[in-house]
Amino acid sequence: MSSGFPPEVLSPLLNLVQGLSSPDNTVRNDAEKSLSSDWISQRADLLLNGLAILAYQSEDPAVRSFCLVLCRRISFRTLPGDSELEVFSSISNESKQSLQSQLLACFVKESVPTVRNKLCDTIAEIARSIYDCQGEWPELINVIFNAVNSPDESFRESVFRTITSLPRLLSGQDSAVTPLFTTGLADPSIRVRISAARAYSAVILESKQSTRDQVIPLLPSLMNILPPLQQDRDSDNLADCLMAITEIAEVFPKLFKPIFESVIAFGLGIIKDKELDNSARQAALELLVCFSEGAPAMCRKSSDYTDQLVLQCLLLMTDVAGDPEDEAEELQEWLNTDDLDQDESDANHVVAEQAMDRLSRKLGGKTILPPSFTWLPRLIPSQKWSERHAALMAISSIAEGAEKLMKKELSRVLDMVLPLLADPHPRVRWAACNAVGQMSTDFAPDMQVKYPSRILEALVPVLESPESRVQAHAAAAMVNFSEEADNKVLEPYLDDILQRLLTLLQSPKRYVQEQAVTTIATVADAAAKKFEKYFDAIMPLLFNVLQQADGKEFRTLRGKTMECATLIALAVGKQRFLPVSQELIQILGNIQMGITDSDDPQASYLISAWGRICRVLGSDFVPFLSSVMPPLLVAATSKPDFTIIDDEVDESKYSEQDGWEFIPVHGQQVGIRTSTLEDKCTATEMLVCYAAELKADFDPYVNEVLTSVVLPGLKFFFHDGVRSACCKCIPQLLNARILASNRDPAKVNELWEPILRKLLDHIQNEPSVEMLADYFECFYQSLEISGLNLSPSSMEALVAAVDLQLKGFISRVQQREEEAKNGDIDIEEDEDMILAVENDQNLLNEINKTFSVVLKIHKTAFCPFWERLLPYMDGFLSGNDTVAKQWALCMMDDLIEFTGPDSWNYKDHFLPYLAEGIQSSEPEIRQAASYGIGVAAQHGGELYAEICSSALPALFKMLELPDARDEEQIYATENICVAICKICRFCSQRVQDLDKVVTYWINTLPVTHDEDDAPYAYTFLAELMEQNHVAVASQMPTIITILAETFASGVLRGRTLTRLMEASKVYLARFPADQVNSVIATLSVDNQRALSAHF
């Protein structure tokens, strides 16, 4: 075996191996140095071959195993001083062939299963490297196919283990694949059958289609492995096999279509089988749930899938109580624990909750609600606390996916949930808090607007529960409710809420204190100025926590307290905060100077806290920048923490609580520390805050932030939040430079030119639709702020990028339509599809805004470039996709608005669609078309006057629709109202019976939602009142009602509001006071207050 290998090498090599495995740190460190400097650098070929020989010759299985692991690890290390070249690639071809031969000899000889496993892993990785370099290893193929017939089951198992690691081994062996797996899946040894199942899954997932086609017919044989495992109660192997099948189902769910009903029946049988371990039952649940994500239509068509799976999920969710004899002890343990983050992810009830959430989000409310609400009304009043708990957690789980339909029945759902906030069992009350919190997020703002009293009157008393965990969860639910609540909703309850939260702040449980502080912060944020009365009582308590709560265990509490104090400062405003601001700044400065540990959570809280203080103090914060910016820049420029470990290595030092997440790659675990990514994102967001708030005062930092943080951050692909924050930072940095330099062209261009190059590159090449929208938003905001002209080459690059992205949009739309046609997806129910459509719509909106700004700056000079996109606009306008048609109409609207009469040159492309669009059944199309008619009247000149005036009958007709003022229609309705206003103002000579038309128009008011268009309507109304036009003179009660609703809505501000108020005073003064007052008396109290506040 070792023929030709220098024997004098083996002895020192064996010593090296023994040194590397020594428990003595000194011995091991010396061996590692020798490995790198003496062996890898000088004798890599002898090292790898020697390890293989020792793996063959040694009588000690532990030595053989370790040599094989070393051989694999070292082969794929990079050489010292060369970051590209791996050790295996660096050795000669002769040495490679020798190593291959030695490994195959080991394969034939090795008899210990655990060592064989290490050997297979090493062989697979060496083979992968050979194949990646277009090499071949025919001897391995021969050994593999010979070993499948070995009488030794460990040899047969090794065949499939090797194939699992490297399915490419079977490339070009199509004729032999079917017999190989037919034999393996029917092997008498369960170990071999399980190994064959894993290999089958890998081949399906990673092989070419020709190889895949050979094994697909064997899918029933794969499934046939399962029943004997269930019969034998072999839970571990059953779970392994189910996981291998799940991997196939996740990618190719439709392969199971011919046997889907059988798969459902078997999977449900496993879930029901309480004699099996939870691992097997959960694996079966995972298999069935994954079909909802990959083939929702197939699941909807099954008669049993949803009904039976929901029932089994609910039954698993009742598995929260444990054994009756242990129930009291387990409850006490649950109540007493201080570790609220303890991992329950493998508990049946948690797995089932997650399954319900996934089913709801993928199948939608129409499918998931009927079976759910068949059982929930029976579980809610159950005598068993575990069933009441399951019902509440089920409501929490399905709320997001079934949001639209559940909102319609929200009152009835609250009837089920709210009484259980007073349940005698603490875990039920905890679950009720959980449901209220989840619903407050998923059903916002309906929960806060329609049912605030019912919710708060039930939730606030739970803050006084005797159990700390229930108190904390009630406070957490209050956070969710308050985040979406108006301060008017909270005001009547603030005394009760804060009195209880301040009591919780004195709790002996630190997690209760932390939650109380967080909730106070959120309530303050929502209450805004209404929180002022509590400022003097609460701030000293928070300062005391920051100064007195010492020790590592209090770091998170202090961090949350920083958050609370600075959110309160934001809520009450600068003048109220100013007297205590220096004290808080001093406290935070001391904390910052005391941070020495890299994992101290206070550091990330400080980053945000300084940002909030900056927002409150504005330019008064500038003196503190020199202290705040250095650690902020360190965090914003930080690199991600990576590690690569082998499967055998203990992962405990890379815990999830420390922010580590791992994915398996080629037999190794690749980890990234996500907590550092979040800190980097927060730091970048704070730079946006500083630049936006301090403006010119931030200019000394602009260059450094741009070059070291923002431009590199645009391609920080590990975290989209970082890239998004960088996009938001660019316009603010430009604005800071513009203000500081008094628009000095040289200084502004110094910043703008590298930004422009980067942005044009990203909007052309970025694959993420969501990020593309951010890049376009950054582009047009930067242009708008700077007012800089684009060069012809930049205009060309912009249009070329948009051309490419529109092609991508069309492709995605076509794919969704094809999938919907085939029944693969339900675009209205599938949450992922809804999000994909929203992302595309958002992207088109941002592209439209980009062109709007470019047209506004360049006018007709941009038209030759804009014209390149006419084929897309023509296609979208004549097509049926609402999103695309709306985008094309908006593009035409901007053309009319910013090029005026010159837009007439393109009239044939859009005029028919404007006329057609104002009568569309789709509100988005009506809104875009009516806006176009309005801007044509305002900016198009005489060429458009006749067309605009002739549109009036159709416009008025659409305002008469019974649902014209419904939530989904209101913006279209208000755009039509404003379009009529513009026609009357700018095309009055073409309008027949103008006074009559204006009188009708008055009755289409008010405009209370569209803040962009409202000024046009109310400027016209003010003119009419100033002129005492007949249309207003004869409609005093109507005018008063319009004014009251307008003022109450807050839709107007600035000069338009001032002018309307002055015109209203003059107008109403023309009428007897008693007549005016009698009309006002008929208004609602809120509208009366709004009128009073504006006169």
Swiss-Prot record:
Record-level Gene Ontology MF annotations: nuclear import signal receptor activity; nuclear localization sequence binding
Subcellular location: Cytoplasm; Nucleus envelope; Nucleus
UniProt subunit comment: Interacts with Ran; interacts specifically with the GTP-bound form of Ran (GTP-Ran), protecting it from GTP hydrolysis and nucleotide exchange.
Gene3D superfamilies named in the record: Leucine-rich Repeat Variant
InterPro entries noted in UniProt: ARM-like, ARM-type_fold, Importin_beta, Importin_rep_4, Importin_rep_5, Importin_rep_6
Major site of localization recorded for this protein: cytoplasm
Stated family: Belongs to the importin beta family. Importin beta-3 subfamily.
A single BP term in Gene Ontology: protein import into nucleus
Domain of life of the organism encoding this protein: Eukaryota
HEAT repeat start-end pairs: 7-40, 44-78, 109-132, 138-165, 174-206, 215-251, 259-294, 303-363, 365-399, 403-443, 445-484, 487-527, 529-572, 575-617, 619-694, 697-740, 747-786, 792-858, 861-899, 907-939, 947-987, 995-1026, 1045-1073
SUPFAM superfamilies for the chain: ARM repeat (SSF48371)
Function, as annotated: Involved in the nuclear import of cdc25 and mcs1. Functions in nuclear protein import as nuclear transport receptor. Serves as receptor for nuclear localization signals (NLS) in cargo substrates. Involved in the nuclear import of cdc25 and mcs1. Mediates docking of the importin/substrate complex to the nuclear pore complex (NPC) through binding to repeat-containing nucleoporins. The complex is subsequently translocated through the pore by an energy requiring, Ran-dependent mechanism. At the nucleoplasmic side of the NPC, GTP-Ran binding leads to release of the cargo.
Record keywords: Cytoplasm, Nucleus, Protein transport, Repeat, Transport
Gene Ontology terms: cellular component: cytoplasm; cytosol; nuclear envelope; nuclear periphery; nucleus
Organism: Schizosaccharomyces pombe (strain 972 / ATCC 24843) (Fission yeast)
Keyword Cytoplasm among record annotations: yes
Transmembrane spans: none
Primary gene name: sal3
Protein name: Importin subunit beta-3
